[in-house]
């Protein structure tokens, strides 16, 4: 039997991205056959158990799990030592002055009159840091999730009174005066301002605009809950007002998942009072298509709609009776796929369902192996606790693809791959061989631009060589997947 090491550490917290990097570094060592270095959340414990590396006894989510399997005792000892070294390593910062600030207050004291603060700490600590920024008269982007909704409301009300903006919580995408923050793409500057209660929705829209030769002035993320009844569109209203005063913004597009109806009406009434024209790209059963919203905006601007980039795939491998399996990293893109697919397929189950009765939650977590038409948002908070976002770490989605292939269920696999700053530097490097090994008919919505670090065409070519049909438009990708299912039903 190969030797293993499984331990739990208390009083240790590390960022999920750093832990993913450590796992990759150790996993690349000769003699290491399995490794998981992660916070001991229920999802990560389930992954460890599937690897045969479950810890003995009870584990707590704030404990650090180190689980390893190696070819022999010497390799195991060396790997454990390498984990310890990687976790304790610090960059040579050169001087005490180079040590980064650990609070917003300290950062504001060090910086030369910043206009914007960024908060990316565990959710329970984010509120105090964001409040400090607001009190100092700065707008704040709260990347952190896990912030209670009542605290979100309090922060946004305080920001409104202070004349600043709260972007977030759980705001993963923004572009301010051409500066990309969080997950964002390299897009040209231009006259369109985006207000986005959706990160990947904003990325899809900004990338399609870029492909049409139209740039953006700003992308102001407001957090996925802002257009809920509980929050009431507080940040959306402030962001619309800010863009209305911006001379570089000639048109505004509001991007969101399905909003609460009464909040959508309130925002629509406020938008009608602005001097800058506002068009909505809020998803709903009646308006399920972000690409159509972009095309309508291009019409407003007098810009011809281009042929959206695509690569053909192998459609002849679709088995009879195939179902739709959507494995997404972006929540809004998953919603868009379900809204487009539901009229053709009927009920589509999901961990972020269109109706509560279609939820994949079993009471003990998300059923990632459910049969039938299924769309999974792997970026949902429940699947990212203690893990890096799937746009950074594809491990969980790759495991689901392999499990689907092994199940024998006939399916068309629909995926998103999101490029840009903050995302996996080469997603096709891991995904293409996984798709080839799975042997499934695959359709990919590839969200990005040629100027992104990963390069849209480079990624599209690699995925197409693996047999996938690739589309720049998620709506087009979804409809192509539905066509494949319909032709082989």
Specify the residue positions occupied by each region the protein language model found.
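Catalytic-core regions of core metabolic enzymes
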Residues: 1-489
């Amino acid at each position: 039997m190969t030797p293993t090491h499984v331990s739990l550490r208390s009083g240790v917290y590390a960022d999920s991205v750093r832990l993913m990097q450590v796992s990759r570094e150790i996993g690349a060592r000769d003699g290491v056959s399995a490794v998981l270095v992660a916070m001991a959340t229920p999802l990560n414990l389930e992954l460890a158990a599937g690897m045969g590396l479950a810890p003995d006894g009870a584990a707590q989510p704030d404990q650090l799990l180190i689980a390893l399997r190696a070819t022999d005792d010497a390799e195991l000892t060396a790997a454990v030592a390498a984990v310890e070294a990687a976790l304790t390593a610090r960059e040579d910062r050169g001087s005490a002055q180079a040590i980064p600030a650990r609070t917003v207050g300290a950062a504001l004291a060090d910086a030369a009159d910043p206009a914007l603060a960024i908060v990316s700490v565990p959710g329970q600590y984010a509120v105090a840091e964001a409040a400090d920024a607001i009190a100092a008269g700065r707008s704040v982007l709260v990347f952190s999730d896990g912030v209670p909704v009542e605290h979100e409301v309090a922060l946004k009300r305080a920001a409104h009174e202070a004349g600043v903006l709260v972007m977030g919580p759980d705001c993963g995408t923004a572009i301010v005066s051409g500066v990309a923050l969080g997950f964002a793409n390299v897009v040209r500057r231009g006259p369109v301002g985006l207000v986005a209660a959706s990160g990947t929705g904003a990325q899809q829209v900004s990338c399609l605009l870029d492909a049409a030769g139209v740039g953006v002035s700003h992308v102001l993320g407001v957090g996925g809950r802002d257009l809920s009844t509980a929050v009431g569109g507080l940040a959306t209203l402030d962001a619309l007002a800010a863009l209305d005063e911006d001379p570089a913004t000639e048109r505004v597009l509001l991007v969101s998942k399905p909003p609460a109806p009464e909040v959508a009406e309130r925002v629509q009434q406020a938008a009608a009072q602005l001097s800058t024209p506002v068009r909505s790209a809020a998803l709903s059963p009646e308006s399920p298509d972000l690409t159509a919203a972009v095309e309508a905006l291009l019409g407003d601007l007098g810009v011809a709609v281009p042929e959206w980039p695509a690569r053909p795939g192998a459609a002849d491998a679709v088995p009879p009776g195939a179902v739709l399996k959507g494995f997404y990293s972006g929540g809004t893109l998953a919603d868009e796929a379900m809204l487009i697919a539901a009229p053709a397929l009927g009920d589509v189950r999901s961990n972020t369902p269109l109706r509560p009765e279609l939820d994949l939650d079993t009471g003990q977590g998300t059923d990632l192996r459910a049969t039938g038409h299924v769309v999974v948002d792997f970026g949902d908070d429940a699947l990212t606790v203690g893990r890096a976002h799937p746009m950074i770490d594809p491990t969980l989605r790759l495991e689901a693809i392999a499990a689907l292939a092994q199940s024998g269920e006939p399916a068309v696999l629909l995926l998103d791959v999101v490029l840009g700053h903050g995302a996996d530097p080469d997603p096709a490097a891991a995904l293409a061989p996984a798709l080839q090994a799975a042997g499934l008919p695959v359709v990919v919505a590839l969200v990005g631009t040629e100027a992104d670090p990963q390069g849209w065409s480079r990624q599209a070519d690699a995925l197409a060589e693996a047999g996938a049909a690739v589309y720049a438009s998620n709506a087009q990708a979804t409809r192509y997947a539905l066509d494949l299912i319909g032709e082989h039903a």
